[in-house]
């Protein structure tokens, strides 16, 4: 199956400093949920921006299928509190959508009827669902979520990831997530990539939870994911390898 995005030997440096990312190989296939985890400063958000073409590469390349439709929920969205903006108007940025389409997107993400509310009056959970609704308006083949549950409480986090799984089942879109919510994310993912400037290990959540590199990075929190993980997906990526790489040809036989 042709990957939606494939990166080979990807490295990124900022201003001539030490590389933020070093020789990273990465791919995501249609319909799979892939989560990138790692400590603060490990390059997770930089990897997402590189895959989307938003930052320059020091080396390597990124290939995307032609015409790939991407829905993006960024890590931070700054809304000027002094500038009134309704949910309806927000959904039409950057491109205009009809009333019926906007209403359907809000319904799909569990926040129907919010069109007239001010963005600044929304709760954290409502705002994340509105962001997701906007990302879904373009009927994406790939949904990219960069730390989508920041500021949510634990029930809100669980509910949001349940919604993501429902959206994936309904739309068949692939999902690429960056997250620190290890306990929840592990159970919501088909494949996990553990990043710390380079790929430390990757594979199914169960395998990554037990990997020495993962446990070295996350310590007792890693033990918790291993203990609580209950995942029954039958998926091709059941391997874990230290420094596992997909190779420069963006081909990965299974």
UniProtKB/Swiss-Prot annotation:
Could you say which enzyme class this protein belongs to?
Answer: translocase
Which keywords label this protein? Answer: ATP-binding, Cell inner membrane, Cell membrane, Ion transport, Membrane, Nucleotide-binding, Translocase, Transport, Zinc, Zinc transport
The segment(s) forming the ABC transporter domain are 5-221
Q: Which Gene3D superfamilies has this protein been placed in?
A: P-loop containing nucleotide triphosphate hydrolases (3.40.50.300)
Catalytic activity from the UniProt record: Zn(2+)(out) + ATP(in) + H2O(in) = Zn(2+)(in) + ADP(in) + phosphate(in) + H(+)(in)
Q: Where is the composition biased (Basic and acidic residues)?
A: 234-245
Name of the protein described by the UniProt record: Zinc import ATP-binding protein ZnuC
Species whose genome carries this gene: Paracoccus denitrificans (strain Pd 1222)
């Amino acid at each position: 199956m042709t990957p939606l995005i494939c990166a080979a030997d990807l490295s990124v440096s900022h201003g001539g400093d030490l590389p933020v990312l070093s020789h990273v190989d990465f791919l995501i296939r249609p319909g799979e949920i892939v989560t990138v985890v790692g400590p603060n400063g490990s390059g997770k958000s930089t990897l997402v921006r590189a895959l989307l073409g938003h930052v320059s590469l020091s080396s390597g390349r990124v290939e995307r299928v032609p015409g790939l439709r991407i829905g993006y929920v960024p890590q931070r969205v700054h809304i000027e509190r002094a500038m009134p903006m309704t949910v309806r108007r927000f959904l039409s940025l950057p491109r205009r959508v009809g009333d019926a389409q906007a209403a359907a997107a809000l319904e799909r993400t569990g926040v129907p009827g919010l069109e007239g509310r001010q963005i600044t009056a929304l709760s954290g959970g409502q705002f994340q669902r509105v962001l997701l609704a906007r990302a879904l308006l373009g009927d994406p083949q790939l949904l990219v979520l960069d730390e989508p549950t920041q500021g949510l409480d634990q029930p809100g986090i669980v509910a949001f990831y349940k919604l993501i799984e429902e959206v994936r089942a309904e739309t068949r879109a692939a999902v690429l997530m960056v997250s620190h919510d290890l306990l929840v994310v592990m159970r919501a993912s088909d494949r996990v990539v553990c990043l710390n400037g380079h790929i430390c290990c990757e594979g199914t959540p169960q395998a990554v939870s037990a990997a020495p590199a993962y446990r070295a990075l996350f310590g007792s929190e890693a033990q918790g994911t291993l203990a609580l993980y209950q995942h029954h997906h039958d998926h091709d990526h059941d391997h874990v390898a230290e420094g596992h790489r997909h190779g420069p040809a963006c081909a990965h036989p299974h």
